[in-house]
Amino acid sequence: MHNQANHRPIIVMGGNGRVGREVVRYLLRHTHHKIIIASRSAHSASANGATPNDPRLVSLVLDANDPQALRQAFADAALVIACIGPSGVLGERVARACIEVDTPLIDAGGYDPLLKALEARQHQEPVDVPLIISVGLMPGLTGLFPKYVIDSTAHGRTPLRLDTCCIGRDAWTYNSAWDIVHSLGDFGQDRGFPVIRHGVHRSVGFFKAMRKVTFPGQIGRVSTMLMPSEELARLARQLNIPEARAYGSNVGPRAALACLRAKLLGQFRTPEKIHRAAQRLAKASARDLRNLQPVYGLRVDVTYADEQRESATLVVADTYQATGVAIAITARCLLEGDPLANGVQMLHEAIDSRRFMQLFRAEGLLAIDGLTAQPHPEWQGGLS
């Protein structure tokens, strides 16, 4: 990939958005490729704010609803990065065009519906390029960081149980809010509050689904609930882990209430209801940030066959910046020739966890506690 595509451009769809801007900034620093910022309307490349007047930035008007235009634009690209949404509205359009012209794809979203659709297509006809989807913080880092913890602590031991707890708070964009509301209905699968046993979701009772988790700094103690996670189920199957549990919570108080309302009223069932609930969630989360700071936290607990437990916690203060950097690091690994399989895959299945985390930590965006006895200077002063 590195030798063949070195002079071909990278297309960043949604490169003028909050996540897309971070992707472009990183790629300008760490690659030599021309970067095409594709959007629905005529924005200049300098409006991106990454590096004004950088000769490597080019703008392109591109409609994700026009399959022919997508194929034409993607045919000469080294890589397509999709930072557009909502994922539940976008569907397979971008991925399908990439498959048809044999261009690799990194998608910030996608989630379970796209994963299943692409796997079904892949069973009918082989896909000749990597399609890495759900490359963000959740899902994305929620699969790769647990893999990293296991890769760093197993030392030949067999993991018997894996628990993850993910919390988040930010002023969610409408597209993010749309996908959050859509996920509240488990994308139509209705698996309740599940424990993952031998890679399969098994629902448990409401009171068995709750867990309180303590995060570092000023985040403190947080109430979380079991939630379905196809990503964690795939990781458990990949590593033959008998039991896994994914807990989560939206820790913005107003946003949490908006999510609870959407869940109880079934506002995830139709696009019209999702639209209205997403608008309310976006407004509620913006109000949360009048007095609170954005934060993303992920705790991982691994229990091994020797009955020893290893724990690690990761905290990020800027969720959209970190999401963009995670996407861009994935792109960097692909462009630099890391050995990647063809076909649809999630982040933890595609990229070596230790290489990814080494590059991520070098950006100074995250704090990790629990994997080393060495002090972390990023913790100094605490987190708010």
Regions of interest found by a model, annotated:
Residues 3, 20, 151-384:
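C-terminal catalytic/substrate-binding lobe primarily of soluble NAD(P)-dependent oxidoreductases
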Residues 10-28:
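N-terminal Rossmann NAD(P)H-binding glycine-rich loop of SDR-like oxidoreductase domains
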Residues 86, 95-115:
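ADP-ribose/adenylate-binding Rossmann-like module
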Residues 61-77, 86:
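Conserved Rossmann-fold cofactor-binding substructure of NAD(P)-dependent oxidoreductases
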Residues 74-80, 100-101:
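Short acidic/histidine-rich motifs immediately flanking catalytic phosphotransfer sites
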Residues 29-34:
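Conserved S-adenosyl-L-methionine
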Residues 108-130:
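Rossmann-fold NAD(P)-binding glycine/threonine-rich loop
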Residues 38-42, 64:
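N-terminal Rossmann-fold cofactor-binding loop
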